[in-house]
Regions:
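Non-catalytic signal-transmission and effector/linker regions of two-component phosphorelay proteins
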Residues: 1-3, 53-60, 64-150
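Conserved phosphotransfer microenvironments
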Residues: 1-36, 40-51, 58, 70, ...
Length: 152
């Protein structure tokens, strides 16, 4: 990562989940600004093992259900998190999703972003010129994910 900078790290744990979390800790220690996302196959055993891990170096955990739209949702969610100041500074609307079930938010976020992007595209067609169309597309509501009420 020193030779070539990365904007995002997505890891899928193999048999030993602790290796993924140890690797995340090493990466976060040296590159704290780089988001680290874990994609896991959904199973009760994996969920139990993840609960025992130190999650401080992981930005998000998602359950891989085979939906390719999840990758777009992850990127959009991280973009929204980075542009969080637009909500208070510029007045961009926000949708706060408060959910602690990894499996549920992994399945709902792709649908939510697909709906928002479709609505933004429809809304942008009402603009008078291309510049206004781009502003309307980028002005879609931001989505924030909180995994508990305190985080929200």
């Amino acid at each position: 990562m020193r030779a070539k900078p990365f904007d995002l790290v997505i890891a899928m744990p193999g048999g030993d989940i602790s290796e993924t979390f140890d690797g995340a800790a090493l990466i976060k220690a040296e590159f704290p600004a780089v988001p680290f996302v874990v994609l896991t196959p959904f199973s009760k055993e994996v969920s139990r093992r993840i609960e025992k891990q130190d999650m401080s170096c992981i930005d998000y955990v998602f359950s891989w259900l085979g939906n390719m739209d999840l990758l777009l949702a992850i990127i959009k969610l991280l973009e929204d998190k980075l542009n969080e100041n637009d909500i208070s500074d510029v007045g961009i609307r926000m949708i706060m999703l408060v959910e602690d079930s990894v499996r549920f938010y992994s399945s709902i976020l792709p649908h939510l972003y697909k709906f928002l992007l479709k609505q933004s595209r429809l809304f942008s067609t009402e603009a008078l010129n291309q510049h206004e169309q781009m502003l309307r597309m980028r002005g879609r509501p931001k989505v924030m994910l909180a995994r508990n009420y305190e985080e929200a």
